[in-house]
């Protein structure tokens, strides 16, 4: 199974405020859909609740410590090891967040699809900094704000070198 993180974050690493996104970027939503459709997606309860529903044409898996939590259209598991066990037959799994889920998988994913939003808003949810000694930038597209995208933004694709990925993944979740 290949783990890939997909996230939109501001230059100051903010990804959200009050359990929601701070910006609207139509191009980012289109990229998200193109990359994740047909694959499994893994997220925490708050992320699922902020989306309001399971996403179509994807296997939705939600991690929640609340045994009574129900997510229509999604499979709910109590923790990360159970999620990985459930998803072990999947070729690729996209990690959607939120903040604590990103932190758990940050050094365990082999790819990172980052939409860097060129602003620095206040927020209450963050991603970790990208360590250039571990993450290799393999693709970049810069875009300007327009009528459908309120801020300048960049699509940044990173690869986590395999030696680090294998060691980190093998030692994780034990």
Question: What name fits each language-model region?
Answer:
Residues 1-174:
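Enzymes that bind and transform nitrogen-containing heteroaromatic metabolites
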